[in-house]
Amino acid sequence: MQFSTLVSLAAVIVSTNAAALLTQTVESSTVVTITSCGPEHTNCPASSPATPAPAPSASAPAPPAPEQPEPSAPAPAPSAPAPEQPEQPATPATPAAPATPATPAAPEPSAPAPEQPASPAAPAPAPSAPAPAPEQPEQPAAPTTKEAESTPAPAPSAPAPPAPEQPESAPAPAPSAPAPEQPESSPAPAPSAPASVPEQPASSVSNSTGPSSVPTFEGAAAKQYITGSVAVIAAALLAL
């Protein structure tokens, strides 16, 4: 505070000195004009035109204008708080910024995302379904014509076994395709295979009126096997 008061006093003194110098220079100029063309000198050739001399006298009131800087002296007073402001920057709020590194913790939850693709391994149980296939081929081993004629109803159930046989060939292309991509497309061909199974048994039943029922069944199974393999290959290509 003492320093600020000293600064303000120095500013006032300087302003007063400057005002005094300005007034002295103005007075000296007026004195020069008066001595050069004063009304006292009657022999002055410029006495008659000296009438405009009052103009310098009019300028004489101008010296008070330099005195106005005195009010400006209080202006330095506000500058005194300036030294006090540097004390405020002492706030060490900036070191708190390192707290932001806490945000990198968020990416950690994203790391488990790559682990989720491991879930597509679930389709692996699908190949286990073909296990019943070896048991079903035992049924067509009895090609008795009399039994086929007497029991036409079981014929529709017989075509069901060939459907599981197709998945045996399906696992071969399955490993070639990436596990995470196929699970989405692989379920599509599965329902298509059973759709074709019930359609063909109808024709086999109509043809099972005589002893030629056995070859028709084998032909239907071969067709189903071909169509199933083609569907599986097409699904694998689409997945790629």
Swiss-Prot record:
State where the protein is found: Cell membrane
How does the record say this protein sits in the membrane? Lipid-anchor; GPI-anchor
Where would I find glycosylation on this chain?
N207
Q: Name one GO cellular component term.
A: side of membrane
* Species of origin: Candida albicans (strain SC5314 / ATCC MYA-2876)
Q: What segments bear the compositional bias annotation Low complexity?
A: 87-103, 193-216
Q: Which gene encodes it?
A: PGA58
Q: What is its main location?
A: membrane
Its protein name is Predicted GPI-anchored protein 58
| Keywords from the UniProt entry | Cell membrane, Glycoprotein, GPI-anchor, Lipoprotein, Membrane, Signal
